[in-house]
Amino acid sequence: MSAPVITTLLVANRGEIACRVMRTAKALGLTTVAVHSATDRDARHSREADIRVDLGGSKAADSYLQIDKLIAAAKASGAEAIHPGYGFLSENAGFARAIEAAGLIFLGPPASAIDAMGSKSAAKALMEKAGVPLVPGYHGEAQDLDTFREACERIGYPVLLKATAGGGGKGMKVVEDVSQLAEALASAQREAQSSFGDSRMLVEKYLLKPRHVEIQVFADQHGNCLYLNERDCSIQRRHQKVVEEAPAPGLTPELRRAMGEAAVRSAQAIGYVGAGTVEFLLDARGEFFFMEMNTRLQVEHPVTEAITGLDLVAWQIRVARGEALPMTQAQVPLNGHAIEVRLYAEDPANDFLPATGRLDLYRESAQGPGRRVDSGVEEGDEISPFYDPMLGKLVAWGEDREQARLRLLSMLDEFAIGGLKTNINFLRRIIAHPAFAAAELDTGFIPRYQEQLLPAPGTLSDEFWQAAAQAFAQSLPARKRTDDPASPWSCGSGLRAGLPAEITLHLSCEGQERALTLAAGAHVSLLGEALAVEHDGVRRTLRAIRQGDSLYLQWEGELRRIEAHDPISAVEASHSHQGGLTAPMNGSIVRVLVEVGQAVEAGAQLVVLEAMKMEHSIRAPQAGVVKALYCQEGDMVSEGSALVELEQV
């Protein structure tokens, strides 16, 4: 049988993974095909492809999850193969079968392997038969509340509800006691149905202080299977990974081999082909428990690439062509250490609520040895509420863990992003934290150090306001004469004939405001985007980026946005929202749980909003009566839109 021919590759995904797959495909000489929703028509992955096909729709369910549309796009574009990326349909056996039935090549495992491992319940049953240790739980077919209540009582609280058909934190809820179970189960089932088209759940004992260690496996069509070392993904928020590194700190060669060989046996038992990841929970005693197998390329694959020097997407393409793996287990490299952080559009101070809006400022850290940025956005892009809020990933490699950590801190300092809330400062605090530097890792890291990682906003100092005001004034666009620095018209800093140069500014930053009058002679000068500040004989250079009406100033490790403040407009805006509950982000209304005239207790669910494939409950801040409803199920709402008016009683 002749080897399959792949000259044109369609990527059935979006964002950074679509861009990353296309980069390797182009390097191998392939023609790349992007698919996009109506919302993503001008998204970066669409712009970078050789060919792009419009799927229509906005929500994933109307575009990226439409198997028939994806198959039609492949045929229309002349693609012989489809790469699923991660998320969406990447672990959908029906998609793999449809691709095969259409005479196309799926860059993933056989549908039978996805069936075996794609369902967490089936995978755990399979591993149980194979003698792999499992966390106590319920993985059965019955999905009613009574069954889950009985299972939770048998397992013992706290428990973790998980969607059987997916990952990424979607459809996952921690339940502390039986009073939370009904609401948590219903919400998790809706999230799972929305994200994966499958509402089935399983429940497990929620282990305390485990590490999340996963093994990268790779298999070809000739029966060969390797493990490409491991990754530690313990630092998570909302059960979704935020920081990943390879190799796992403190793992002995013996434990690495034991976990790697167990992962290979798991893959071979189901006839696996391609890239996959076997995830384990590792306790402090060195015992590991099978958690799940992801039958796809992982978000965090770049750290494995960094320590092995391999291109896993290139391996996927070559394996799909029928080539054998190019090395033996003994030849798999392990060089140095790599750490990755995920950059999200979200508000860490507000329970990591996804953020939407325009990327007014977006500048990536400089490329160089040991530095890598995988992203799917550019300055000026709109971040919509329809998809996962990840913008990209920063990856640093070093000869040892500390070199990688310091290099990553430098990359985070160089990164400039503005226009919407992101987790970049939160990431920097994690990487700079003494416990992270000491590799004291487990899945409770973020909750344990929450006060340091998410500090309450402090009062901005006088030094900050002076520097901000000088940078704001000196960057005003009124500088008319650039050809003659000595001309009085070359400066818009408030110069008035016969009087001292003076300018008064009313500025705001992060909810704080200050009025400042600047006189000539301050020891602050702005040259390009470098602000030189002198204080008590010490001269520092800060980054100051003017972007439209905003100034972004790097201060004490964080990029802060400064704007001109209008006190009258601010007062009017605050009065307009009194008594009203507004949408915290763009999204769609999936449930309205109250009626006009209904009395509600403090904390009661009023409305459920879906954005970025996650549900967010709008709750009553105090007891009251519903005076008005401004939304109904199915409505699309914008951030700040009034949803419910509550009258306090």
Predicted features and spans:
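N-terminal beta-alpha lobe that positions the nucleotide/phosphoryl donor
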Residues: 1-278, 282-300
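Structured core elements
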Residues: 10-11, 54, 83, 160, ...
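A generic structural motif
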Residues: 207, 294-297, 347, 525, ...
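Catalytic cores of soluble metabolic enzymes centered on carboxylation/carboxyl-transfer
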Residues: 263, 302-522, 602-605, 639-645
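Conserved nucleotide-binding/hydrolysis modules and their immediate coupling elements
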Residues: 519-542, 548-549
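C-terminal amphipathic alpha-helical interaction region
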Residues: 534-540, 554-555, 596, 604
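Catalytic P-loop NTP-binding/switch module of NTPases
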Residues: 539, 545, 549-583
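Structured functional modules or segments
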Residues: 571-649
